[in-house]
Amino acid sequence: MLVNTFNLFVIPQVYFMRILFFFFGLIHAAAFAQPPSKPISLKSKNQWVDSSLDKDGWKYFQDQYTDESALSEGNEEMPFVPSLLESGKDLFSSLTGFSFSIRRFRMKGLNNRYFSQSINEISMNQLSDGNIPWANWGGLNEVTSNNQYAAGLKENEYQFGALGNSVFMQLNASKLFPQTTFTLNLSNRNYHQRFAFTKVWSENKKGWTIATSVAFKQGIGGQLTANEFIGFSYFFSIDKRVDNHLFSLALLGNRQMNTRTAAITKELVDLTGSKQYQPSWGLQTGKVRNANWQFNHHPMLLLSHEYNMHEKIKQVSSLLVSMGEKYTTALDWFNAADPRPDYYRYLPSFFTDSLLAQDLISQIQLNPSQLQINWDHLYWINQNSTTDKRARYLLEDRVEQSKKVVLNTRYRIQLNNRLLVSFQGQYRLEIYHYFKRINDLLGAAYSINWNQFAEDNLPGSTAIQNDLNNPNQKIYVNDQFGYNYRMHLQQWLFLSQVQYTLPKFDFNAAVEYNATNYQREGIYRNGVFPQNSYGLAEPDYFRNGQIKMGLTYKLNGRNYYYFRTAYSTKPPLVNDLYISPRISSHKQTDISNETAYMAEAGYILHAPSLKLTANAYWISIHHAMDVMSFYHDGYRNLVNYTLSNIGSRMMGLEFSMAYSLSAGLTLNTAINAGKYIYLQRPNYSVMADNEQYISEKGILYIDHFPITGLPQLAVYTGLAYRSNGNLFLNLSSSFMANQWLSFNPIRRTYGAAQNLPSNLDNKLISNPSAIPKAFIVDFSAGYSCRIKKFRDGHAYYLQFFFGVNNLLNQSIVTGGYEQLRFDTPGGDLNKFPNKYYYSAGTLYSLSIKWKL
C-alpha cells in the first residue's frame, strides 16, 4: 500500500543519463588527457582561513586528499602506486557538512550511534544513547579543528570507525599549530557575539609545550523574541617530552546556558502571522521570561602517554575523567489548568461551534499575549489557591548528572614498509543520575512529592507517593522530586587492525569484541511499583563484535577504486531497554542485539583540475529497539510504547566533484540520492506509567515506510573563487527533498484503522507526512592581509570572513513530527496536528581574526 509513496525517490532516467555523460566527459578529459602536474607541496594546516566559523564547505581545497608530489611520481610508470592520503574531510563531507545541516541531513540515513568521535584516541560516544556530546567542547573551534576524518568504512589506525563517519581529534599541546590569535564574531544566530583568545607555544628546549584557549559567547533577542544564550569555553593543555616519552595533560569544557525552541502547528502560524512564534515565553511584571532553558557543563580531564618503544613500535595510553550536569527546564502543575498557551483546548480548532471559534480568534487578534505564558497569573494562583500556599505551578529542572572514566591503550607496530598492525583495549565506566529538581516555586511556599497521574487514576492509594521511603515529603527550591534513579554502564573493548600495502592494492581489516553491562539503581521506592523500583536491579550483559574489510585498487596516482564491507552487532541502548526507568526496572520482553550489514564501493579521482568521488552504499539493520513515552488520550495516562524487531535498509549514491574552470575559479557539486526505508513489521506493546501490566500488544504496519527526519535527496552546487591565497568568494545552493516527519506509531496499528469512521480512508491516517522541498542559497567571502612582517620571518595578519545563509530569506520547514497524541475514535488529524520547526530566515556571521 505504501510502496507507491516512494515515486519521489526515482530520478528520471533521461536526467540521470545526461548527468552520467557529462561527468564521463569530465573524467576522461581530466584523468587521461591532461599532462602531469608539477609537484605542489600542500600545507597540512590551514594558515589563513578562520577555523572558528563552523563552515567547512568553502574551504575544501585546504583538505589534504593526496600528496601532489606523489601524484606526479605516480604518472611515471613507477611499480609502486602511492596510497590515498586524507588528513581532513573527504570532498563530499566538506561540501555538504554545513549546507545540508539546515534539514538535519545525516550521511547514509544512519542514526547517531553509527557515527563516532574520539579525542586523544578515547571515544566520546555515550553508552546511554549513542550520541556524541559535541556541546561539551563547543566554542573551542581554534583547537578542536585539529582532527582527522574517515568517511564510511575507510581505514584508520585509531579506532574501529563507524558506518557513517569517524572524527579523530588530537588535543595534545605539541600537536597543535603554534599560534596567537584574537577572534571576534558578530552574528544574528543563537549567539550574537563571540570573543576568543588562543595561544599555542612551540616546544621549548626542555621539552615543554603549552596551549590554551578561551571563548565567550552571548546573545539576547534577535530573530526570536525570548532568545538568550551565554557560554564560556576553556581549554588548557601541557606536554612534556622526555626521551622517547611524551606525557600530556588536557583540561577542557564548555559551560553553556541557552533557551530552546519548540515546534509549532500551522494553526499557530496563521493565528500569529509568524513562523517564529514561540509558546514558551511570556511577560512577568512587564519583562520577558522564558520557561524553556537548557544548561550543559561537563569538564573533561585527559591524560595521555606516548612511548616510542622501538622505531617500529609505539604505545599510546589515554585516560579520560569527566563529570558534569545538564538539564532542561519546563513548567509543571498539580491539580491546575494547563499553563501552556498552545494547549490544544485553548485554540480555535478545538471548538466545533464556528461562532465560538471565531470569537476566540478575535480575542487573540485583540490580545496577542493570550498566546504567551501568563507568568503573573501563575504567581497569583500559587499565592491565593490555598492558605498554606502549596504550589499549583512550578518550574522544574529535568537533570542528568554523569560521571565517566575511560582508559584506552593502543599498540602500533610497523612490521615492515608494507604491513601495519595495531592492538587496542579500552575500559569504559559511565554512571548517570536522573532526577527532577525544583527550579522556582513561582511564589508558592512549598510543594509535595506526589504523582499527579496516580492520584487521578488510583485515588486514595499509596500509588500517589513518588517515594514510599519518604511519604508526603514537602519539597522546596533545589529539592529533588518526581523520579530519582541511577544507571551504571560498563564496557570492555578489544580491537585489532591490519593495513597491508602492495604496489597496486591496499588491504585493511579490523576485528572488535566488546562486552557491555547495564544496571539500574532506584533511589526512590515508587508507589506504583514498590517491589520493582528501589535499589539495584538485575544487571543485563551483552556480548558483541564488529568486523570490517576493505580493498583499494590503485590504477595510478590519480585513479582509485575501492570496496569495503562490514558486519556489526551492538547492544540495545539503555534508554531503549527499560520501559520506564523513571519509575521502575521493568524491561522490554523482546531483547536482542542490534545487527548491521554494510557494503560500499567507490571511485576517487584526484587530477590537477578535477577532484571527484563517487560512493555507492547498501546498509541493512535488524533487531533495533525503541521506547516512546507520551500522554495517551485513550488510557488517560502517560504511556510507554515499546518497539522491538525494528529493521531498516539504506541504499544510495554519494557523489562530489570539484572542477577547476580557470585559475582560481572552481565549480563544486555534491549529490546524495538515497532510499531509506523500514523493513518488516516491528512489534509494539503499551504499558501505562501507573499500571503494572502490558495494556496492549501488536505489530506496526510500517514495512517499506520511509525513514523519517532527514532528506533522502540532497544536491549542492557552488562556485568558489580564490585569488592569490588572500581573497575567497563562494556562492552556493542546496536543494533537499524526499523528507518526512517523525511518525506516530499509533496511526500505523490495526486498532487505529479498525476504529476509524467508515467515511474515512485509512490511507489518510497511515501514509507518511511529507515535508516540502527546500532550496537554499548561501554566500561566503574571506580576506587575509598581512599587517606587518618582522626580520625573523613572522608576521601579523588580519583576517576577515563574512557568511550569509539563506540569501532568499525563506522561513522554510526544517523538520517536525506527528504528535504522539491521536484521536483514535474519530481519526481527526486536525485535533492533534503535525508540529513543525521553521528556519529563522537570512542569517549572517562576520568574523575578524588577528593572528600574531
Language model features: what each stretch is:
Residues 618-620, 641-746, 849-851:
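Gram-negative outer-membrane beta-barrel transporters
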Residues 246-304, 327-396, 459-477, 627-630:
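Acidic/polar loop-and-plug regions of large Gram-negative outer-membrane beta-barrel proteins
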Residues 263-264, 268, 464-465, 469-472, ...:
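Surface-exposed extracellular loop regions of Gram-negative outer-membrane beta-barrel proteins
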Residues 93-95, 122-153, 170-176, 277:
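Short acidic/polar hinge/loop motifs at secondary-structure boundaries
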Residues 156, 165-203, 212-226, 732:
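Short strand-turn segments of transmembrane beta-barrel domains in outer membranes
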Residues 667, 735-753, 783-852:
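C-terminal beta-signal and adjacent terminal beta-strands/loops
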Residues 394, 420-556, 581, 683:
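Signature of Gram-negative outer-membrane beta-barrel scaffolds
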Residues 276-300, 304, 487, 537-546, ...:
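Outer-membrane beta-barrel signature, preferentially recognizing the C-terminal barrel domain
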